[in-house]
């Protein structure tokens, strides 16, 4: 049988309107003990996906655990991207067991769930496995998650992937939403977010535009 290639994307690729992003427990108490990623990279990656999601109009849920009594506020890099958006504060370590959060998931009504947060082995594994068990497609932004050790993070990622979750990175998430530099309506936003938060890739964009007036869409 001869295969016939067509210039069309895989249905596995994310679109801005086909998923819900859930940002979980990006809070001081969890960050203090996170060792699998340094705090600077973690905050940059959290900011990148937050500003990307906001700019592309992705349905986003922000949730914390014991914010006032133990864990502290959500990272300002995230809340600044979603000014005025309410946060769902929980007692459950597994976000998927919180009725208010699940009510919001159902209200939004998307079959794809993208997860990021702290810690990978507790507050990300729980909702990932639970959502998969209920028939949702789950994606996990691995470098916008963290745990108390590399071992804890890596084993959690292994467990989720073995259950059917699809791993990705923060820059991959942003560029998957853009996907075509000819999409001029989001071009400046995407490159602006990358310049600010995407490390050496962002430096490269700044250099190319400054030195050569580069524009990827042409």
Give, region by region, the residue ranges found by the protein language model:
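Glycine-rich phosphate-binding loop at the start of an alpha helix
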Residues: 47, 99, 121-125
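Glycine-rich phosphate-binding loop signature in dinucleotide/nucleotide-binding domains
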Residues: 105-111
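Beta-hairpin (beta-strand-turn-beta-strand) motif
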Residues: 65, 91-93, 118-119, 143
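Active-site acidic carboxylates
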Residues: 1-92, 107, 137, 157-161, ...
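Short phosphate-binding loop-to-helix
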Residues: 90-103
């Amino acid at each position: 049988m001869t295969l016939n290639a067509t210039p069309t994307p895989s249905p596995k690729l994310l679109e801005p309107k086909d998923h819900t992003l859930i940002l979980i427990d990006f809070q001081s108490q969890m960050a203090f003990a996170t060792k699998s990623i340094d705090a600077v990279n973690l905050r940059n990656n959290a900011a990148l996906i937050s500003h990307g999601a906001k700019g592309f109009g992705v349905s986003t849920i922000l949730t914390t655990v014991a914010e006032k009594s133990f864990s502290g506020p959500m990272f300002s890099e995230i809340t600044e991207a979603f000014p005025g958006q309410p946060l769902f504060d929980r007692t459950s370590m597994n976000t998927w067991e919180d009725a208010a959060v699940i009510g919001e998931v159902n209200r939004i009504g998307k079959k794809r769930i993208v997860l990021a947060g702290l810690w990978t082995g507790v507050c990300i594994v729980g909702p990932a496995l639970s959502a998969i068990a209920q028939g949702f497609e789950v994606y996990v932004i691995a470098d916008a998650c963290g745990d108390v050790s590399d071992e804890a993070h890596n084993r959690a990622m292994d467990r989720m992937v073995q259950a059917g979750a699809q791993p990705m990175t923060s820059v991959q998430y942003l560029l998957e939403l853009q996907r075509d530099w000819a999409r001029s309506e989001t071009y400046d936003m995407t490159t602006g977010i990358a310049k600010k938060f995407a490390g050496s890739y962002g430096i490269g964009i700044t250099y190319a535009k400054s030195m050569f007036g580069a524009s990827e869409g042409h």
